[in-house]
């Protein structure tokens, strides 16, 4: 089984410039999900939305082409893709010729779909429907000037002057305000930080929490988000941990957690988890991305 420790992270790596799908390194979601009590049917919906800022290939005449790429990986897929392997895979397009943009998109979709769904069919009937492919969108240079920058909407938790003493996840800080009427509100913070579980490099994020139910104590919520500061976990895993801690501790009627992480190696990852069916948020970067 692939683990973070035997991934390309933290290792000296040769950068290949000829297409090689074997560079992709999927890691099973199940191990970290078991830590937060998710072992059967998922209690959430959603996806991991990636943006690639460093994608290039050659056309059939050898002329370089560039694009921004957006990828949408369903959270029900059994695997995540380790980000350095994703970067190495994209770099392998650099000196590879493709007939057109559609050929690049098709290759990306096929390879990434195979990686995130790998091993999904081991115990599945041969008559079962094929798993969905991931979403792939390429944005060409003539549209670059239309790329917006938006901050996450919501009431800022960062306005609160709280004392912070916990720097590893402390779900006991989460609580609801007793004897208050139910609310529907959207809260945001720019203070989420965690670390890569292999290299220890910092991962910075803005997070948005939308919920309906008993009002969540905002000071405790901010302290809880700050408590991830020295925590070692991948982006997707942090967001699922936040979702499950809120879901089990505060018992909202509805809940959605969305984080936008700053880019590393030309890639950003923006996980979204929700307790109910809804459209994915627009994959629009914020100022720090």
Swiss-Prot record:
Subcellular location: Cytoplasm
Active-site residues, Swiss-Prot/TrEMBL: 196, 203
Keywords tagged on the record: Cytoplasm, NADP, Oxidoreductase, Queuosine biosynthesis
Its EC number(s): 1.7.1.13
Chain residues that bind NADPH: 83-84, 264-265
Summary of the function given for this chain in its UniProt record: Catalyzes the NADPH-dependent reduction of 7-cyano-7-deazaguanine (preQ0) to 7-aminomethyl-7-deazaguanine (preQ1).
HAMAP family reported for this sequence: QueF_type2
Protein name as it appears in the record: NADPH-dependent 7-cyano-7-deazaguanine reductase
Organism: Albidiferax ferrireducens (strain ATCC BAA-621 / DSM 15236 / T118)
